[in-house]
Amino acid sequence: VFGAGGGTSSYQEIEETDLIVMWGSNAREAHPIFFHHVLKGVHNGARMFAVDPRRSSTAAWADVWLGIDVGSDIALANAVGREIISQGLTNDEFIAAATEGFDVYAEVVDDYTLDRATEITGVPGDVIKQLAHEYATAETAQLCWTLGITEHHNATDNVLALINLSLLTGHIGRYGSGLVPVRGQNNVQGGGDMGALPNKLPGFQDVENPDLRGRFEAVWGAEIPAKAGRHISLMHESMDEGILRCLFVLGENPMQSEADSGEMRHRLEGLEFMVVQDIFLTATAELADVVLPAAGWGETDGTYTSSERRVQRVRKVIDPPGDARDDIEILCDLARAMGHDWETPTAEQAWDEMRALSPLHGGMSYARLEDMGGIQWPCPDEGSDGSLFLHGRLWERPVTTRRAPFHGVDHAPPIDELTEEFPTRLTTGRRLDSYNTGVQSGRYASPRRIAGSIDLSPEDGATLGVDEGDRVKVTSRRGSLEAPVRFDRSLRPGLVFMSIHFPDQTDVNALTLDAWDPKSGTAEFKATAVRVEAVS
């Protein structure tokens, strides 16, 4: 919608806004540092809404919790939009001057009455109405989301439905109001910024634009493919079809992090050749033909970029152990082994080459990053101090650049349908003390650790006739596993939760579905149909 893949606001604004909406985000556990900024906002008087199927530890801080049914976010967002329009709460001046496509959007959301939305989402109509009125009438508001929005087969449409609300109300492009997609893990933002995307060059520049491509080719001395590459789910399809036969995996554990892990194992084992470059011998590395030991955090120089677009320096403090080496050294050695005359640059030299090609980063020298304690892009030159928020251009009159488009999107239920055979909805996520597939965090003890359990509502536990700690069998259309029961009063009957952190004990991705969003390639980790049975 806006041209670059980053949040529009800064954490400072979260602390000073009037209203915070946490939608599909259990930031209290998954992004605890970010949530400190949210709590500062709450303590400074901000109202807070939480939209989440579970009454999570984040939702517990909210003034209002909307206990949405899994996979019904678009229906809820469209109903909020309809209520704002029907009650005359839209920012008409902003819509007329800075957006396009409003009439088509209004026609789409007109079908999402409060009654229909309640039927689809399970959220009472008066609560939907309250969210609509408070969001529309707040002087400033921040709309935040994470993987509860993006790990669905219609992830992109989910995001578009939320962006529509900011355009309706003018909560974009000005201090205190914006959109905050909190990234899934450390430096995901930085990876995207650097072009670790199949359709973008560094700085979110379109790889299919010949003029942009030509600038990079002139510096790199190589021809860049004119077509965008495959996102991860298309790569899976290419493995299935025998088109993709070799894989180079850097810092990823797809054997345990991808949906439908049984099928993923089949794909990886069917490759002709696989290289894994990582700091640990992951389950994926155990399947590799070659493992290249890489240096970790504290063993390399470079930068990280946070969800507020802030680029910060990281510094090497110790040498990597054993045969482990810096990623740059490994990649340059590989290039030389393949016949290319590559020098091995320092991290700063690699960064300077990138920022010379990316207008978002042009003014971010290492010296300035250190002196300023980090800089938020865009920072086009050394006369710029970066940008607290994005898209202030939408408040210029007249708007001389591209207007922000509305997108009319419709509700589509989860692919994995609930049936008599699979009557329970499983959703997955994170816990406070653990990290992703547990390769790093599983190596130390924690008094807060909740291992590979399945969380049930007490009501479902009573129906199954199980007590806390008893083992149950969880079966989906793809696989099954056993796990101990943990009762969680934040869950409603019919909804169960498992974390992603303990695949060696309870491989939750043996259950999940490899149905993916055609636009983003993200699999539907959040909505699996399962059957839960007591183990005798």
Annotate each predicted stretch with a short phrase.
Residues 517-536:
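Long, low-complexity intrinsically disordered regions
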Residues 292-293, 508, 515-517:
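Catalytic alpha/beta core of large soluble enzyme barrels
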Residues 375-456, 463-511, 533-535:
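Long, compositionally biased stretches
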Residues 173-175, 420-422, 526:
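Short, basic and Ser/Thr-rich N-terminal targeting/leader segments
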Residues 1-187, 193-194, 206-386, 394, ...:
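Cofactor-pocket helix-loop regions in the catalytic cores of large enzyme subunits
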Residues 7, 128-130, 231-235, 407-413, ...:
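Glycine-rich, charged/polar anion/phosphate-binding loops
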Residues 201-216, 414-421:
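Short flexible/disordered coil segments
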